[in-house]
Swiss-Prot record:
One of its GO terms (cellular component) is proteasome complex. This is Proteasome-associated ATPase. The gene is arc. Residues 583-584 are annotated as: Docks into pockets in the proteasome alpha-ring. It comes from Thermobifida fusca (strain YX). Homohexamer. Assembles into a hexameric ring structure that caps the 20S proteasome core. Strongly interacts with the prokaryotic ubiquitin-like protein Pup through a hydrophobic interface; the interacting region of ARC lies in its N-terminal coiled-coil domain. There is one Pup binding site per ARC hexamer ring. Upon ATP-binding, the C-terminus of ARC interacts with the alpha-rings of the proteasome core, possibly by binding to the intersubunit pockets. ATP binds at G272, C273, G274, K275, T276, L277.
Amino acid sequence: MADRDDERHAERDRDELVAQVSYLEKELSVLRRKLADSPRHVRLLEDRLQEAQTALAAANAKNERLVSALKEARDQIVALKEEVDRLSQPPSGFGVFLRARDDGTVEIFTNGRKMRVNVSPSVNVDELRPGQEVMLNEAFNVVEASSYETVGEVVMLKEILEDGERVLVISNHDEERIVRIAEPLRDEPLRAGDSLLLEPRSGYVYERIPKAEVEELILEEVPDISYSDIGGLNGQIEMIRDAVELPYLHKELFREHKLRPPKGVLLYGPPGCGKTLIAKAVANSLAKQVAEKTGRDVGKSFFLNIKGPELLNKYVGETERHIRLVFQRAREKASEGTPVIVFFDEMDSIFRTRGSGVSSDVENTIVPQLLSEIDGVEGLENVIVIGASNREDMIDPAILRPGRLDVKIKIERPDAEAARDIFSKYITPDLPLHPDDLAEHGGSPTATVNAMIQRVVERMYAETEENRFLEVTYANGDKEVLYFKDFNSGAMIQNIVDRAKKMAIKDYLENGSKGLRVSHLLQACVDEFSENEDLPNTTNPDDWARISGKKGERIVYIRTLVSGKKGADAGRSIDTVANTGQYL
């Protein structure tokens, strides 16, 4: 029984082992199949991993784009919100600050009303200045400081009131108004006659406007013309130096001798003889004398060149205003101790004899204005008036009387000696001289130049047939022959030299022969005479004679003695001559 049980147990164990072996064989077979499939599976997993990584990178890039778009959208929303808030704000107005009060409020002027308002804590009240613009919110409180007004009306200052903060001005319609002085003008010296910028609503003047038409009358500070540059006028130069420089340089001596210095000088004579040059040389000489007297390296003087016709204005009172401003400018400069020359060129054009009927009678108000200004110079040092004219007979006698234009100096046409002196200013030894001319004088440039000047002066001043210019008939029947020398001037001499130099340049360009020759000067002299032969044409020979410097018996007839280009002499009668407007 026991054996049978053992057999059954052994058989059962054997079956279990067989089953276990069969199971393991199956498992082994499965594992072998899986092992055979594992490389392909690994590759598949690797491919899936790479695809997943690529998808992840794309997702990250998309996420970044979304973040950027969201940020941009948020910024746009913020900007739009700010724009909406800004556009929805009420408009800000502007006002003009008047003054601050002790309680922290300020007074402003806006929309035609004077208001007392509060100030934002961001605005420093102590930095606000009268007349300054300020920005206002909807409650008219000051929230920001602005600048000053830059546009408005131009008015003329008439008077500064006693408080120094207000002025009396005159508008373009001759209306008087009292206005306040804004801060930018508080420290500037204001004078009657100044042009100011007015903002009419607030009543503040902000700026002084320079008058361009008056500034243009000022030619230069120190002219570069000296007495050594002027030839043939030594006597006149000595006279004007005595009249102008002595009183300025030796004030004590004049005061000791109770001698009043002259207030004005009149330079008169034919055109082109050096009147303007002398006036400029006076200013230059005074500047040098000031430098020596004060010990400075550079002297200073002012030369106010007033061109007569430029002063005239079609509006009533404008010419007089210009004259006042000119003398006001002279007083300003002279108050600094600087000599000032006020030079009126072509004085007869604006200061004609009153009531003469030869103009529009504008001189009836202009002449008194000048007289009052000249008389006003009496108590003012360092200012002298110099007038120049070639028709001194047309200037109002009140201007020429002693005490106004005290010294009268006639600038004559140059004689032969004066002409040599003038030529020496333009023909100098340092110029290129032709070798042939140099050889004739031993190679000496100085001797050559002197010989050239002597030859051309002899040609100009010879009373020969070829130099005969005019025959004039006087009212008493007398006749006189005038030569070209009778109409010579410094300007004509300069023109002759310029012509000769141009001829020398053309000769050098054409044939290579360089240098100035005496033949150039002689030919230039002939050409200059030929050009001027047709100039004495006028309906009134007597007026022409006065301008040309020929005074005396009235001239009734002029006949030219120079053969014209057509070879015919032509007598010119006062009844038949056409007025060309040209004068010799």
